[in-house]
Amino acid sequence: MKARLIATGERAPSWVAQGFAEYQKRLSHWLPFELVEIEPGLRGKGRDARRATEDEGRRVIAALPKNAYVVALDVPGRQLSSEQLAQRLEHWRGQGRDLAFLIGGPEGHSPEVSALADEKWSIGPLTLPHMLVRLVVAEQLYRAAAMIANHPYHRA
């Protein structure tokens, strides 16, 4: 099983790229994990945000691995504790499918992308910059994998 984080947005600043690379390296023992950055749709004065979201959606769909289990990060999605995420990760491993975690653009996911999601996950009620969400997802996947492996990283 492999995991892919498909994130709509600009190229990550160095501090995000460095943090992501650190968790990606740590996760590599248990779960190969890659980042795919999706170019954001054009927004601004006189531009249609709906069209930008639809354009992003087409690019996200094209980046999905075949037969992947799709988890869309979405504000109204299900909130999981770290322990619950570890249980989900074990369940997903049992399915034998690759995973795709999706971070949408400023207006969220297109209806087409939302319809493809096998489940929706919310980081929580806080509003976070999408770049920070990349790090939170990477860290929480590492924490979940460490819990499954009885690694001492997680101490609750």
UniProtKB/Swiss-Prot annotation:
It is found in: Cytoplasm. Gene3D superfamilies: 3.40.1280.10. Homodimer. GO terms for cellular component: cytoplasm. Its main location: cytoplasm. Keywords: Cytoplasm, Methyltransferase, rRNA processing, S-adenosyl-L-methionine, Transferase. The keyword Cytoplasm applies. Its EC number is 2.1.1.177. It comes from Stenotrophomonas maltophilia (strain K279a). The gene is rlmH. It is an enzyme of class 2 (transferase). S-adenosyl-L-methionine binds at L73, G104, I123, G124, P125, L126, T127, L128. The lineage of its organism: Bacteria, Pseudomonadati, Pseudomonadota, Gammaproteobacteria, Lysobacterales. This is Ribosomal RNA large subunit methyltransferase H. Signal peptide: none annotated. Belongs to the RNA methyltransferase RlmH family.
